[in-house]
């Protein structure tokens, strides 16, 4: 086991559903909002490809996690509790992940966030460019438009899987790993999730390293 000394505070609460607006509003994305969002999507696609290339350079073996998560998105099985509480119907009930996101998650299954093990810690100056540019660090409240846009993006899915591995590897927050995965899928472990789609993956929920505290 590789031990990495780093203070690993828990990210902000995964779901904050208070103060929801009582009156539903149509799910409409304005042209202006599309124009603002498009460059971010393009940058994400380019940056996630760089991350994929890094996995390949490290000879990481891809799994099938991305394919399973993509299937769940098409079946409307992602973010079930958030969608149930979304009175305004702003969060996408079904989704199709991009091919690059699927490939990234396939590699992440076996990398377990080791390549980016210092991302999601308080030491944001040690974060990689991909997570510095695309990880959401704002208010987690579905009345916040930025948070809804994040949840509807591929990165909204990626972050919850990465937070699962982050908490799993932390000496202080292992118990919170289940919470991250349940927010995305209702499953408490990735092995149970994968088994439900006929994939047997040994040691999937065993951390390959442990993050230790430091000041």
Swiss-Prot record:
Subcellular location: Host nucleus
Keyword DNA damage: no
GO cellular component, one term: host cell nucleus
A Pfam family recorded for this sequence: DUF1247
InterPro entries listed in its UniProt record: Protein_Ac34 (IPR009657)
Subunit-structure text: Interacts with host proteins P40, P34 ands P20.
Function: Plays a role in the translocation of the P40 subunit of host Arp2/3 to the nucleus. The robust nuclear accumulation of Arp2/3 induces nuclear actin polymerization to assist in virus replication. Mechanistically, subverts the host CRM1-dependent nuclear export pathway leading to Arp2/3 acumulation in the host nucleus.
Record's protein name: Protein Ac34
């Amino acid at each position: 086991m590789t031990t990495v000394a780093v203070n690993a505070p828990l990210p902000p609460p995964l779901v904050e559903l208070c103060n929801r607006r009582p009156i539903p509003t149509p799910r409409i994305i304005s042209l202006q909002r599309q124009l603002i969002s498009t460059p971010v999507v393009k940058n994400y696609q380019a940056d996630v490809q760089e991350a994929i290339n890094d996995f390949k350079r490290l000879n990481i073996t891809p799994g099938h996690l991305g394919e399973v998560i993509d299937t769940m998105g098409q079946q409307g099985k992602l973010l079930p509790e958030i969608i149930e509480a979304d009175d305004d119907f702003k969060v996408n009930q079904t989704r199709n992940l991009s091919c690059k996101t699927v490939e990234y998650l396939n590699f992440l299954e076996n990398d377990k966030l080791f390549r980016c093990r210092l991302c999601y810690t308080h030491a944001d100056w040690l974060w990689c460019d991909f997570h510095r540019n695309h990880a959401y660090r704002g208010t987690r409240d579905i009345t916040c438009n930025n948070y809804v846009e994040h949840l509807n993006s591929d990165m909204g899915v990626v972050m919850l899987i990465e937070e699962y591995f982050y908490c799993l590897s932390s000496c202080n927050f292992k118990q919170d790993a289940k919470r991250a995965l349940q927010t995305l899928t209702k499953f408490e472990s990735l092995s149970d999730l994968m088994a439900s789609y006929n994939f047997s993956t040994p040691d999937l929920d065993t951390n390959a390293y442990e993050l230790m505290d430091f000041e």
